[in-house]
From Swiss-Prot:
Family, as annotated: Belongs to the dimerizing cyclase tstC family.
Free-text biotechnology note from the record: Phomoidrides A and B (also known as CP-225,917 and CP-263,114) are potent inhibitors of Ras farnesyltransferase and squalene synthase. CP-225,917 and CP-263,114 inhibit Ras farnesyl transferase from rat brain with IC(50) values of 6 uM and 20 uoM, respectively. CP-225,917 inhibits squalene synthase with an IC(50) value of 43 uM and CP-263,114 with an IC(50) of 160 uM.
Keyword RNA-binding in record: no
Source organism of this protein record: Fungal sp. (strain ATCC 74256)
SUPFAM superfamilies xrefs: NTF2-like (SSF54427)
Protein name: Dimerizing cyclase phiC
Function: Dimerizing cyclase; part of the gene cluster that mediates the biosynthesis of the antihypercholesterolemic agents phomoidrides which are dimeric anhydrides. Within the pathway, phiC produces the bicyclo[4.3.1]deca-1,6-diene core of phomoidrides via the dimerization of the monomeric anhydrides leading to prephomoidride. The pathway begins with the highly reducing polyketide synthase phiA that catalyzes the formation of a C12-fatty acyl-ACP, starting from one acetate and 5 malonate units. The hydrolase phiM is involved in the release of the C12-fatty acyl chain from phiA.
């Protein structure tokens, strides 16, 4: 008898909790992305600008539109940068050239999204100023070409020099989200952070506008000199 009452009480509590929860899907039945945990605009825990390396406000200005204008970030990448996308997923690996990293990852991902449009926000910046190391938390939001809501969180662990150039980058992303996005929108392949990438693999969408096939030859010659 007590067990029956306990089960009835548990069922009633479960139904009451479910009735107060916000719906997890939109009107079309698509899952809703979780809201960003940070407030905008970005608040700096160290707003100083008289820094030995890079200041947090300076980083925010450079990375404010990384999803749609990665070329602006390229200007602050050292030619011999060590760039590694961590994990075990299609984008993972070591890249000796940041352009290859961009084409094989962000550009390829953009080709899976509606109108190639991505809303990117810098959630938080940690470190920097008199420390050569920084951590940037980035949030990306878009709609896939299949019409599904899409979001991705990325973490950049970066080392800068006194000339404000990126010398080392380790970036962490949601591997499951990347694999689902590519699986749903193109032919899927895999990789790991133990692989060194020397070839351009932008995916079925091809190269970014303004970059032609000669880039492959130029990059090959450049890599042979390393």
């Amino acid at each position: 008898m007590r067990l029956t009452r306990s089960l009835a009480l548990l069922s009633a509590c479960t139904l009451a909790a479910a009735s107060t929860q916000q719906p997890l899907t939109d009107s079309d039945g698509h899952p809703k992305p979780d809201p960003p945990p940070y407030e905008f605009p970005l608040k700096f825990d160290n707003p100083r600008t008289d820094c030995k390396y890079v200041s947090q406000p300076w980083i925010a200005d450079i990375f404010k539109n990384i999803a749609n204008d990665f070329a602006d970030v390229f200007k602050y990448v050292a030619p011999d940068v060590t760039f590694r996308i961590m994990g075990h997923h299609p984008f993972a690996g070591a890249y000796s050239n940041p352009k290859i990293a961009y084409i094989n990852s962000l550009h390829r991902l953009n080709n899976c999204l509606k109108d190639n449009e991505v809303d990117s926000k810098l959630w938080a910046i940690h470190g920097g100023c008199d420390s050569e190391w920084t951590i940037m938390e980035l949030y990306f939001n878009a709609t896939t070409k299949r019409g599904l809501p899409w979001e991705l969180t990325s973490l950049w662990v970066s080392r800068w020099d006194e000339d404000k150039l990126l010398r080392e980058v380790r970036t962490y992303v949601d591997a499951g989200q990347i694999m689902r996005t590519l699986w749903d929108n193109e032919i899927w392949w895999n990789s790991s952070d133990r692989v060194t990438h020397y070839d351009i693999m932008p995916g079925p969408g091809g190269l970014p506008p303004g970059i032609n096939a000669s880039l492959e030859v130029d990059l090959s010659e450049e890599l042979q000199e390393l």
